[in-house]
């Protein structure tokens, strides 16, 4: 029954987009603007498959891609098929999963202050902040991640910070801003967005929390919704977050959280809100075109 509801929801959403191919023209211009940002694509196959399911609905949204991860190449292939998806670089300085680690694009020798003894990024925000990281190496590594993204053949529109790490101090934020400016990219949260994340919401409450938030969405700003999706696969069943122990609860775990957020994105209730014009979906491609990178403002 649940699967049937998800399928019906996807059909509703596809019908809505077919009836209004340019940015869902059937939606009211006075409806609150909502920007769905799906983070961590490229992390692994499970996340890539989940993002593709959302992309296949035709729903316009933005994705933040981890170009430091081995699975980013599959993510690139997937995203090239979906013009409804706007792509950003998920600037990474951490590798938080136990037994599944990654390191910098520039390698251990290129940025030695950013890695542990075997060349992986540090597992948590606290560990990174306590380390003797070099800001020059941070800038070189973040630039290398953007350059890898630009070479991928995807249109890259914006950057944001994986785990908030690249914006965790005023000095790190300045580095991230310089990198974005150098490549003419937008920065997520620099367009006056209000921010809501499903990340810490209990699994059973994710859908209701999102629907309630959207029902009360602001009309004086873009409503940014941060989402993390994944399919339930063996690799996701055993994954363990070394940065956020709250995600590793015995009754749920990371996979339950991310599968729950995928089901929320595919729910018939969300599809109906889009179809009926109660919300108007936008992406960072539209915000950059509207405001320009010169019009961005650092969030307060």
Regions found by a protein language model. Give the residues of each.
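Bacterial N-terminal signal peptides
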Residues: 8-20
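Active-site gating loops and adjacent loop-to-helix segments of metal-dependent hydrolytic enzymes
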Residues: 102-129, 240-253
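Catalytic domains of cell-wall/extracellular-matrix polysaccharide-remodeling enzymes
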Residues: 132-218
């Amino acid at each position: 029954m649940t699967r049937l509801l998800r399928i019906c929801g996807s059909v509703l959403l596809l019908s809505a987009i077919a009836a209004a191919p340019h940015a869902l023209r059937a939606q009211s211009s006075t409806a609150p603007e909502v920007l769905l940002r799906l983070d961590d694509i490229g992390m692994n196959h499970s996340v890539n498959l989940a993002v593709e399911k959302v992309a296949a609905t035709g729903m316009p949204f933005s994705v933040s891609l981890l170009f430091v991860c081995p699975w980013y190449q599959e993510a690139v292939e997937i995203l090239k098929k979906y013009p409804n998806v706007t792509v950003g670089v998920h600037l990474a300085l951490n590798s938080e999963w136990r037994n599944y680690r990654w390191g910098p694009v520039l390698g251990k020798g290129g940025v030695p202050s950013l890695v542990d003894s075997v060349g992986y990024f540090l597992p948590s925000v606290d560990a990174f902040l306590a380390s003797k990281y070099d800001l020059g190496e941070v800038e070189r590594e973040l630039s290398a991640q953007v350059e890898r993204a630009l070479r991928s053949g995807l249109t890259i529109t914006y950057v944001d910070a994986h785990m908030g790490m690249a914006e965790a101090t005023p000095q790190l934020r300045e580095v991230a801003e310089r990198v974005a400016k150098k490549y003419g990219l937008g920065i997520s949260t620099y367009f006056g967005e209000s921010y809501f994340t499903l990340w810490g919401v209990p699994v059973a409450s994710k859908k209701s929390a999102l629907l309630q938030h959207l029902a009360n969405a602001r009309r004086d700003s873009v409503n940014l919704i941060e989402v993390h999706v994944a399919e339930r696969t063996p690799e996701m069943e055993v994954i363990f977050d070394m940065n956020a122990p709250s995600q590793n609860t015995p009754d749920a775990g990371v996979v339950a959280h991310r599968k729950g957020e995928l089901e929320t994105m595919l729910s018939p209730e969300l599809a109906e809100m889009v179809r009926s014009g109660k919300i108007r979906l936008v992406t960072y491609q539209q915000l950059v075109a509207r405001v320009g990178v010169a019009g961005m403002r650092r969030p307060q």
